Amino acid sequence: QTHVMLGSHTYPIGHPKQLTMFLLNNILGGGSMSSRLYLSLREKYGLVYNIDSQAVPLSDTGYWNIYLACEPQHKDQCLELCHKELKQLRDTRLTATQMQRALRQLEGQMAISAENQENNALAMAKQMLYHHHAPAWQETFAKVQQITPTQLQDVANEVFAPEKIYTLLY
């Protein structure tokens, strides 16, 4: 089995583009079987055992990565397909339908996550530490709903630029 990670730097906690990155990552591969990476590499081609992406804001920086596990003979094709999805997000603005689908998916994930008391307490504690305010998930989602397809594409071009992406194979 081969493990592959692609990633780059992204925004710190509180950055104005943090929520845009959060939504963009969710579309790409964050936490859902309807993400682009999952649908392509797992469902369509059956190349990976698992695949996801995450965007992690830290106090002074942040990082974003894709992780996948596959058979060694599939790693090159998997890398090619990952880069294809990144390029598509850089080059093509989401349609209104795609945007609404992404927002509905994220809203459902946030609502389900809020039902977990431990997750909720940890998220609220982090918010209090960094912002001295712990908004309900609905307040955060209302801000996410203001994100435009153009803003998503701008962040994709900034964060997913090929020259900024590092690759780790092990």
Model-derived regions: residue spans:
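His/Glu-based metal-binding/catalytic segments typifying zinc-dependent metallopeptidases
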Residues: 1-35
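Conserved catalytic core of Hanks-type protein kinase domains
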Residues: 27, 127, 131, 159
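Bilobed periplasmic-binding protein-like "clamshell/Venus-flytrap" ligand-binding domains
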Residues: 153-169
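M16 family metallopeptidases and their MPP-like homologs
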Residues: 5-11, 42-91, 96-147, 164-170
